Design a protein with these regions (language model features):
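Recognition helices and adjacent regulatory flanks at domain boundaries
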Residues: 33-34, 39-59, 65, 104-111, ...
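Short amphipathic alpha-helix that is part of the acyltransferase structural core
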Residues: 2-43, 87, 142-178, 288-292
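Conserved catalytic-core motifs of GNAT/GCN5-like acyltransferases
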Residues: 137-153, 271-281
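Conserved beta-strand in the GNAT
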Residues: 57, 63-73, 87, 193-210
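A short helix-loop-beta-strand connector motif used in the catalytic cores of GNAT acetyltransferases and
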Residues: 45-57, 178-194, 246-248
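Acyl-donor binding region in acyl/amide transferases
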Residues: 78-144, 212-269
Length: 292
């Protein structure tokens, strides 16, 4: 292992060839279906058009042994400074190189892109511990979730409709170009004379009970124009939204408001930023646009 580590090279994924090599490695490691790989390769030039790279990889001689993909979420203005937000996704290392080489790989990422803000929305327990150890922080969020059976009697005159992405009004300090991703919808919720805008992500996961397989459909609210209103009318909105999206479960992360009597669930959203005023970044234009 010591001898092999002398040949390790850290590289930015810039060219089409680099991207193809990294995606081929990740497809094999994560056992993706080929259409996911094709989607990454076709979408990344658009997603990362304001960057000149698509991620990083590590090679031992000429063999890819680790890779991380980047999704450019946009820009955020912090204390009169405009900084890019990068969602790190699909972090995978060859089994023989896990441990210290993995941590060194992450440290390279943070040093090479020291003026960028990094997010991670999909870390498992092991990855979360490693990321926290090197300086990532947990986003200050509380997660609420509700099954359709728990909201079924919350009738209301709330109306929901799909709207064009250009109709959404994202926060003033965020600059981003919204893209139609897989399972992504832009919605308007009308409550009496008030209107609430949402970006949602629908996932269809395969589940099995007593050997019988079925599709488990979950909708996640990844952004809202008015968190206080969403929290106030949580169960009524859930009822309408689950029916509208044909889902069985609704999930949402709240920053300062939280639905009354809702149970707080754990979330695994992380970020790396040297500015103490930032508590969270919504997962808009993140890996959720492509991956489940």
């Amino acid at each position: 292992m010591n001898k092999k580590s002398m040949n390790l090279k850290y590289l930015q994924i810039k060219s089409d060839r680099d991207l193809n090599d990294a995606v081929t490695f990740l497809e094999k490691g994560f056992k993706w279906k080929k259409f996911k790989s094709d989607l990454v390769k076709s979408k990344f030039p658009i997603i990362n058009k304001h960057l000149n790279f698509h991620g990083i990889m590590i090679k031992d001689d000429k063999e890819v042994i680790g890779a991380i993909l980047f999704f450019h979420q946009g820009f955020i203005n912090i204390e009169n400074e405009k900084r890019s937000i990068i969602n790190m996704s699909s972090w995978y290392m060859h089994q023989k190189y896990r441990g210290l080489p993995s941590i060194s790989f992450l440290r390279y990422m943070l040093e090479e892109f020291d003026n960028y803000i990094f997010t991670n929305y999909s870390a498992n327990n092991v990855a979360e511990k490693i990321l926290l150890k090197i300086g990532f922080k947990k986003m200050q969020l509380k997660r609420a979730s509700l099954l359709i059976t728990e909201s079924i009697f919350n009738f209301s005159n709330i109306k929901i409709k799909d709207i064009h992405k250009d109709s959404l009004k994202i926060e003033n300090n965020i600059e981003t170009i919204l893209d139609e991703g897989i399972g992504i919808r832009f919605l308007e919720v009308k409550i009496d004379r008030y209107k609430l805008q949402l970006i949602t992500k629908k996932r269809v996961l395969r589940r099995s009970i007593f050997g019988v397989e079925f599709n488990w459909r979950t909708t996640t609210i990844i952004w809202t124009s008015n968190e206080a209103m969403l929290a106030r009318y949580w169960k009524k909105i859930c009822n309408k939204l689950l029916i509208y999206t044909k889902s069985m479960k609704l999930v949402c992360d709240f920053s300062s408001n939280f639905p009354q009597n809702a149970l707080v669930k754990e979330n695994n959203y992380l970020y790396f930023c040297n500015n103490q005023s930032l508590d969270y970044i919504a997962p808009i234009q993140s890996e959720m646009n492509i991956f489940d």
